[in-house]
């Protein structure tokens, strides 16, 4: 009888550990708020980016991109992405206005059609310009758009990290959840 009771305790304890019984929403939110506060104050930024797309045969295509982001105080950030090459995407532009609580506003300018296409909130999970990124990935990440669970501490590539689960509040999100490894020193996402 004692052996059966001890076995049952081990089974229940193991199940509790694997289901996130020790997850902490409070600590997860604290970590997310601290990461967000460390990202504030940049004002604006510019970047030259090279996007490399690989097909299933291993062939690659490079796209030259300019990015400009303006930090918003209470409304969220605004960013403009312009494709400079290759020729088939030259002049294509993507404008995003991130909102803290509501759905983001996003538009795509297609020079071949001379049209601006609004990206519907129900289409945020769609692929961004033929890449594995979604329109949702391109937008700024706002604390208010997720609930959080601190899962554990774990080392990743020699860095001491928090492991935090992000659960999107928006039911139209392309993600059910995201598990993020964030270093403890700088609060940067590494995985």
What spans do the regions from the language model cover?
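N-terminal mature ectodomain segment of secretory-pathway/periplasmic proteins
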Residues: 24-112, 149
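Hydrophobic alpha-helical segments, especially N-terminal targeting/anchoring helices
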Residues: 54, 110, 154, 182-183
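N-terminal secretory signal peptides that target proteins for export/translocation
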Residues: 1-2
């Amino acid at each position: 009888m004692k052996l059966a009771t001890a076995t049952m305790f081990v089974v229940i304890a193991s199940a509790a550990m694997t289901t996130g019984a020790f997850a902490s929403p409070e600590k997860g939110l604290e970590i997310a708020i601290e990461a967000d506060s460390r990202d504030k104050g940049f004002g604006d930024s510019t970047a030259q980016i090279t996007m490399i797309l690989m097909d299933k045969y291993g062939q690659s295509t490079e796209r030259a991109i300019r990015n400009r982001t303006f930090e918003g105080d209470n409304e969220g950030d605004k960013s403009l992405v312009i494709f400079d090459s290759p020729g088939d995407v030259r002049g294509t532009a993507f404008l995003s206005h991130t909102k803290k609580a509501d759905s983001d506003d996003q538009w795509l300018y297609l020079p071949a059609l001379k049209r601006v296409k609004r990206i519907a909130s129900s289409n945020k999970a769609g692929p961004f310009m033929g890449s594995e990124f979604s329109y949702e990935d391109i937008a700024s990440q706002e604390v208010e758009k997720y609930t959080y669970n601190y899962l554990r501490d774990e080392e990743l590539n020699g860095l001491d990290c928090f492991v935090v689960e992000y659960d999107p509040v928006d039911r139209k999100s392309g993600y059910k959840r995201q598990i993020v490894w964030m270093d403890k020193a700088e609060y940067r996402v590494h995985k």
